[in-house]
């Protein structure tokens, strides 16, 4: 990491308004401009290496002689071992295991501005305002603020507005945002 001054910030990211006098630059940091493409490549590799994929709506999980049984609407699948990796949705499947797994939903806010990825060349975190902006293939992704809010509560429009206002404060005029969502 390197400490940078006001002019170095401008040299690195000229579209950020010149309101910061110092920052920290991580020259070896990396990010994915399209995480979905990476996941699809990994999935293709999984299939090429002999992995199998069934898209099913799992309704319940039980055990028979220590083996997990995944039940769908129409059939059951028995495995020697299984990993439940459904993120925030895992609790719905694990509730009937007889153990209280303390899992809640951490929801992160995202706002997407289309066709603005040229404004930044790397992710930038504005720690004093609690948000970050990352250039993606599809535009700029503005992220910040998290909450424990469950799976079913609607997103907070005031948090979305805060992200939009912060992004405009740092970068100036931006077009109307294209999308907003919660990441679980």
Predicted regions mapped to residue ranges:
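Dinucleotide-binding Rossmann-like beta1-alpha1 core, especially the glycine-rich loop
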Residues: 1-7
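Flexible hinge/switch segments at interdomain interfaces of large molecular machines
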Residues: 11-18
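Active-site substrate-recognition segment that forms the wall
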Residues: 63, 76-77, 81-184
């Amino acid at each position: 990491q390197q400490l940078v001054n006001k002019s170095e910030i401008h040299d690195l990211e000229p579209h950020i308004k010149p309101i910061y006098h110092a920052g920290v630059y991580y020259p070896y940091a990396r990010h994915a401009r399209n995480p979905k493409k990476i996941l699809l490549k990994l999935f293709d590799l999984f299939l090429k290496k002999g992995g199998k994929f069934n898209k099913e709506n799992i309704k319940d999980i039980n055990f028979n002689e220590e083996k997990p049984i995944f039940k769908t609407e129409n059939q059951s699948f028995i495995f020697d071992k299984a990993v439940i990796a459904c993120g925030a949705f895992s609790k719905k499947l694990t509730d009937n295991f007889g153990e209280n797994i303390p899992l809640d939903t951490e929801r992160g806010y995202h706002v997407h501005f289309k066709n603005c990825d040229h404004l930044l060349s790397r992710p930038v975190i504005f720690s004093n305002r609690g948000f970050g902006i990352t250039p993606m293939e599809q535009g700029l992704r503005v992220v910040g603020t998290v909450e424990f809010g469950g799976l079913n509560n609607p997103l907070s429009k005031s948090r979305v507005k805060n992200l939009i206002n912060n992004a405009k404060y740092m970068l100036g005029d931006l077009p109307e945002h294209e999308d907003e969502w919660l990441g679980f």
